[in-house]
Amino acid sequence: MNILMIAAENDALAGAKVGGIADVVRDIAPALAQRSHQVQVLLPGYQSLSEQSGSQRHDRFEVTFWGRVETVELYSVPGRNPVDGVQQWVVEHPLFAAAGKGRIYCDDPPDRPFATDASKFALFCVAAAEAAKRGLFGQLDVLHLHDWHASVVALLRAYHADYVVLQSIHTVFSIHNLALQGIRPFDGDISAVHAWFPGLDIEYKRVSDPRYSDCLNLMRTGINLSDKVHAVSPTYVAEITQPSCPEQGFFGGEGLDPDLLAAQQQGRLIGILNGAEYDSAVEPKLDSELERLLLAAESEVINWMSKETHCYSGHSIALGRIQQWLRNLDQKSGDKQMLLTSVGRLTDQKVLLLRQTMLNGKSALDNLLLQLAGRGRLILLGSGDPLLEQFLLEVAGRHANF
């Protein structure tokens, strides 16, 4: 099959990663290529990816957006580790650098959530749809849309007269973060559906937000308008077809569970277990490997601190802890403590259970670290909710193994 993946991130390109979606897009493309499929991956260029060494402009074409004609450019980019059967593409337009050159996401104020990003990715999606219609990627068999950023392709495919031709191509929609749903009004704002595509005749009941009926929900759009919906595991499918209950630390369908349950009953929702690929099974050399990791971490934290006008307490605590662990390695040979690591956004989805107060009055994370004392260490790399950052900083100040 000839598969076109459409996404906001892709770690196959330097500078195109913020979160886990980039890892999935990077790894799934060569995995499919190994099964004799042709895979093409398309991203916004953010006015920087097209400048990478070896990139070439392949086409320049026009799309209609905000009621006017916009010109976009399509570039091929070799990527960091080119793979046979995988072609990397980026599409460029000044709007894709709305947050600054090379920045993938914008931080909009609370009264206009997703506004800049939604407009940016809507333009990206109409460019992707136009390029696919023009045959710039060859005869496509599958459009693989990643998260809400790519779901406007499904909207155009369903309702826009210029792009209903894409209905002959199968669509798959992958859910990466169900909590971020890309909600924007239908009207009354420059970042609204009918501002992007004036006169678009939409079946509102299939794409409107379940809480705000005057708004488009781009996550729901991808779920309801795609032929197949993919989630990261069979267990996760069982979770997201149930209502969320954040008070108990359970994050299910985030308001979209009725749509997800319907998709499951229709045979459209599938859970495929995410995996991690390792080059080979190597017997770990604990002392030398841990020392090398800690030295690299020490160097990186110092590099971060050098760019700060005022010292961030999280970096100070981390540097002190890393140096303490290095001293302990020097003093004691054969350190057999296990090392736990976590990298991710600090959101309630990931951290809420760790904040829960146990019977002894301590948080779950405090209790875990107490149980690990002398037996294991935890390194957590992440940023996000300031309240969660502060909670983790306070815990780090209490435990020598965090």
Range-by-range predicted roles:
Residues 1-402:
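Catalytic cores of nucleotide-sugar-dependent glycosyltransferases that transfer UDP/GDP/TDP-activated
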